[in-house]
């Protein structure tokens, strides 16, 4: 429904607006373990306590969500929402199966918790289509975030939120108080591009390019990394999540990696509690296959 759409200055602004209207200092936000560093930073700015929810090779674990809710409620704290990236998650690259999405929505609905569904990578699948958006199953309890930053141009800073009617006015007021309105120039540019250009073909070409680079990274990891290391095998998006033996500190290793002209993000950046020191996020979206192998 177009009436449910709130245009934002990228989906990052939508995260800020949601945090502003929901979070009081000390409130709890549930998030996947690991989770997007930009979201964690926003929640921290509003003094939320982030409680990470267990994940596995398929994404967020429903029983882990039940356990996290129970633990937080028993501590007497308030849960304001669950933040998640179900499609090619950042940083893991995992695609959450449809049946888990339904189960997670049922849990959230039963417990009276909003779900913030962040979906910047949903159109960037290589191997199979993404399941339906979680908001398609529950428009009253899911806030859906979208962005053109990963599919058209990050510098345009145009995103959107699909919000329940009960929240839209609050989000509009919060947005007006911070930026007055998103850039009309950027919106008109995006609108014209979508109307006049073969944007679906452009995204398909991106997917073909990223798939080749993803394959090069996975092949290189198989060839060069030790058998004690593990990594995800994403079907889309930008990222591979690597888990090394626990004695390896990826943050301490970073200076040596930079000297060798290798860039990654240490795993601790994706946890609010400093966990994940033996993990790292690798990105294959920019370097060529030759550079990835090098």
Where in this protein do the model-derived segments appear?
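Conserved core of the PLP fold type I
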Residues: 1-111, 122-137, 143, 210, ...
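Glycine-centered flexible beta-alpha turn that most often forms the glycine-rich phosphate-binding loop
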Residues: 118
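Conserved core segment of the aminotransferase class I/II
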Residues: 136-138, 143-208
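Short hydrophobic/aromatic beta-strand micro-patches
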Residues: 162, 241-243, 283-285
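Conserved glycine-rich beta-strand-loop-beta hairpin in the small C-terminal domain of fold type I
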Residues: 191, 208-218, 229-243
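Short, conserved charged micro-motifs
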Residues: 248-253, 290-293
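PLP-dependent enzyme catalytic core of the Aspartate aminotransferase-like
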Residues: 259-261, 272-294
